[in-house]
């Protein structure tokens, strides 16, 4: 299972990319807006494009960039503009009627599409049939309403395997390291997570205790 970072922060991407385990990045309008607001910079079309190019050059893998349009025609136009920014860009579309229409057209043009905001296996099936390269079920948000995000992911992965659909599953809306473990065990192709969760994957108190003990023992015997 590949590991993606769900962020628009170049600093966070550079930090995790240095570990040698980062395969891609997912962004959304909220994440991008936060980055520009924090810098006090205007979010112009040129600045946004430059920021996406910098992300692509840093990660070296797929970078999902989401449209803000709600109607298919506008989604297609915006998707083309996003895809033209860099070859690594994957156009992110909402799983709606208009999103499906746009997905069909963009994928027919050879533009990769990540269908997002998926909360059912049927939505994933529709997205795959519309030509999506990726489908993104939201584990955490499903858990939030007392449903089972893991069960949703299991259904989608199994359905795609049974139907032999050429689409990758991105486990999204990941809230904690257990979601990552669950996604890997259930057969997700990719898990995308916030920077904080990525850092938590590496942390374990016994690792810190063990390292401290090794160093203390070494200090006792070294020349």
Swiss-Prot record:
Location (main, coarse): cytoplasm
Gene designation: tal
NCBIfam families: fsa_talC_mipB
Keyword field: Cytoplasm, Pentose shunt, Schiff base, Transferase
Keyword Thylakoid on entry: no
Enzyme kind, highest EC tier: transferase
Family: Belongs to the transaldolase family. Type 3B subfamily.
GO molecular function: aldehyde-lyase activity; transaldolase activity
Family annotation (InterPro entries): Aldolase_TIM, TAL/FSA, Transaldolase_3B, Transaldolase_3B/F6P_aldolase, Transaldolase_AS, TSA/FSA_arc/bac
Catalytic activity: D-sedoheptulose 7-phosphate + D-glyceraldehyde 3-phosphate = D-erythrose 4-phosphate + beta-D-fructose 6-phosphate
Name the UniProt record assigns to this protein: Probable transaldolase
Catalytic site: 92 (schiff-base intermediate with substrate)
The organism's taxonomic lineage, starting at the top: Bacteria, Thermotogati, Deinococcota, Deinococci, Thermales
EC number, as in UniProt: 2.2.1.2
Entry annotated with the keyword Cytoplasm: yes
Gene Ontology terms describing biological process: carbohydrate metabolic process; pentose-phosphate shunt
Pathway entry: Carbohydrate degradation; pentose phosphate pathway; D-glyceraldehyde 3-phosphate and beta-D-fructose 6-phosphate from D-ribose 5-phosphate and D-xylulose 5-phosphate (non-oxidative stage): step 2/3
GO cellular component: cytoplasm
């Amino acid at each position: 299972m590949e590991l993606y970072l769900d962020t628009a922060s170049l600093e966070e991407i550079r930090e995790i990319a240095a570990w040698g385990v980062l395969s891609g990045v997912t962004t959304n309008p909220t994440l991008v807006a936060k980055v520009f607001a924090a810098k006090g910079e205007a979010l112009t079309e040129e600045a946004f494009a430059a920021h996406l190019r910098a992300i692509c050059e840093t990660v070296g893998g797929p970078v999902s960039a989401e449209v803000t349009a709600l109607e298919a025609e506008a989604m297609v136009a915006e998707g083309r503009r996003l895809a033209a920014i860099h070859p690594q860009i994957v156009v992110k579309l909402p799983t709606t009627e208009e999103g499906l229409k746009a997905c069909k057209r963009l994928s027919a043009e050879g533009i990769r599409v990540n269908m997002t905001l998926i909360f059912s296996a049927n939505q994933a099936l529709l997205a795959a049939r519309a030509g999506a390269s990726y489908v993104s079920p939201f584990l955490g948000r499903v858990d939030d309403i007392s449903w089972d995000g893991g069960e949703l992911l299991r259904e989608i992965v199994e359905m795609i395997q049974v139907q032999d659909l050429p689409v990758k599953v991105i486990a999204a809306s990941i809230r904690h390291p257990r979601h990552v473990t669950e996604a890997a065990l259930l057969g997700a192709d990719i898990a995308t997570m916030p920077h904080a969760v990525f850092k938590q994957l590496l942390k374990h108190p016994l690792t810190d205790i063990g390292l401290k003990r090794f160093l203390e023992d070494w200090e006792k015997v070294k020349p």
